[in-house]
From Swiss-Prot:
GO annotation terms (biological process): L-histidine biosynthetic process
Catalyzed chemical reaction(s): L-histidinol + 2 NAD(+) + H2O = L-histidine + 2 NADH + 3 H(+)
Subunit field text: Homodimer.
Record's GO cellular component terms: cytosol
UniProt cofactor(s): Zn(2+)
Cofactor remark: Binds 1 zinc ion per subunit.
Binding-site residues for substrate, renumbered to this chain: S240, Q262, H265, H330, D363, E417, H422
Entry function: Catalyzes the sequential NAD-dependent oxidations of L-histidinol to L-histidinaldehyde and then to L-histidine.
CDD domains: Histidinol_dh (cd06572)
Protein name (record): Histidinol dehydrogenase
EC number per UniProt: 1.1.1.23
Pfam families reported in the protein's UniProt record: Histidinol_dh
Residues the record marks as active site: E329, H330
Length: 443
């Protein structure tokens, strides 16, 4: 059962298992062979030719002749001066909340004695250098700068590099300044990912790359993450999505606004409404059409609605089960007492509870991070946080008594795995300790 548009109400119980599976399928995102090959060529050229290739690709893809790849401090200051105070104050408020939430994520040192004389610790260190990719296009995304730059600063990353297609919007440059980012480069697309992964005369190589992008950027991140000479990435990326669970007390206008706020991201976005109330579903369909007519990106949102769903269920529990199976990037619970069911939610990037928690709050300023796993990756990946900008190390320290107390266990396991050198590393020390003890006793 494939609906032709978002006005079609689908009764979940009347669908076969195969139809239900199809209803929860997402728009395909597999990179075409052409994109894969093009990106591979871009990576190789940037690695071999550096800035020359970056300027060539800027001319070819962005239709901009770039003389200086790096944005100067004076250019950032000028951009900041052009911004209105309202925008600056809004960004400052967002940063404050993001700081509070991400500061709370700092991990304490784990320090335990697993048995007498055996001390084990877990400590964290910041990733030394990170690269942030901020898309260009028809609308700037300064909020993504804040979402990436703030935790990078809190984590203590020594070097934070930002790349964005030319010309870079004033809002992005000011957001970078607000986050303390000094190395900003006007390059975009797969070539920007290549520059940060391999380095060039102007752009420093980084250890890990963060940020969203189009199919070419996504494919470039995938490829560099699989190369020994490349860089790690934040998470696999897919089209944006939202799933709303609504009960009979929900407000259709609120639901429609939340669905459309996701649909306007791109034609490959997907939005889903789950409700046991058919009247609510029908009212939402009407609201969507009315609000859609007023949107500046109505054409984009309408395309996204073609692969979206209005699903009527038997009850609220069935909504929860379907949502967990789908694993949405954003999950909105427009139900009474949402806190009573949050423990049943297993797979979601970020959850918005109640009528007064629009997705937009998390996208911009509540404090949570808006970089989230999509495309079903919520079953194994988490929303971006401070942990993504640090790495964990374990430390162990054994006293002589600690080693003696653990020696037979280690030797037995090493012998079972036929790893003689592992066993010898313990046996030699035990022998040395016993010899020393014997010598002391003789004295």
């Amino acid at each position: 059962m494939q609906p032709t548009n978002f006005n079609t109400l689908i009764n979940w119980q009347q669908c076969s298992e195969e139809q239900q599976k199809a209803l929860l399928s997402r728009p395909a995102i597999n990179a075409s062979e052409r994109i894969t090959a093009t990106v591979s060529d871009i990576l190789d050229r940037v690695k071999a030719e550096g800035d020359s290739a970056l300027r060539d690709f800027s001319q070819r893809f962005d239709h901009v002749q770039v003389a200086d790849i790096r944005i100067t401090a004076s250019e950032i200051a000028a951009a900041s001066a052009r911004l209105s105070d309202d925008v600056k104050h809004a960004m400052a408020q967002a940063v404050r909340n993001i700081e509070i939430f991400h500061n709370a994520q700092k991990m304490p040192v784990v320090d335990v004695e697993t048995q007498p004389g055996v001390r084990c610790q877990q400590i964290t260190r910041p990733i030394a250098s990170v690269g942030l990719y901020i898309p260009g296009g028809s609308a700037p995304l300064p909020s993504t700068v804040l979402m990436l730059g703030t935790p990078a600063r809190i984590a203590g990353c020594q070097r934070v590099v930002l790349c964005s297609p030319p010309p870079i919007a004033d809002e992005i440059l000011y957001a970078a300044q607000l986050c303390g980012i000094q190395e900003v480069f006007q390059i975009g697309g797969a070539q920007a990912i290549a520059a940060m992964a391999f380095g060039s005369e102007s752009v420093p190589k980084v250890h890990k790359i963060f940020g969203p992008g189009n199919a070419y950027v996504t494919e470039a991140k995938r490829q560099v993450s699989q190369r020994l000479d490349g860089a790690a990435i934040d998470m696999p990326a897919g089209p944006s999505e939202v799933l709303v669970i609504a009960d009979s007390g929900a407000t259709p206008a609120f639901i429609a606004a939340d669905l459309l706020s996701q649909a306007e991201h791109g034609p490959d976005s997907q939005v889903i409404l789950l409700t046991p109330d058919a009247a609510i579903a029908q009212a939402v369909a009407v609201e969507v059409e009315q609000q859609l007519a007023l949107l500046s990106r109505a054409d984009i949102a309408r395309q996204a609605l073609e692969s979206s769903r209005l699903i009527v269920t038997n009850d609220l529990q069935q909504c929860i089960d379907i949502s967990n199976a789908y694993g949405p990037e954003h999950l909105i619970l427009q139900i009474r007492q949402p806190e009573e069911i949050i423990d049943q939610i297993d797979n979601a990037g970020s959850v918005f509870m109640g009528d007064w928690s629009p997705e937009s709050a998390g996208d911009y300023a509540s404090g949570t991070n808006h970089v989230l796993p999509t495309y079903g990756y919520t079953s194994t990946y988490s929303s971006l946080g401070l942990a993504d900008f640090v790495k964990r190390m374990t430390v162990q320290q054994l006293t002589p008594q600690g080693l003696l107390g653990l020696a037979s266990t280690i030797e037995t396991l090493a012998q079972a795995e036929q790893l003689t050198a592992h066993k010898n590393a313990v046996t030699l020390r035990v022998t040395a300790l016993n010899n020393a003890l014997t010598a002391v006793n003789k004295e």
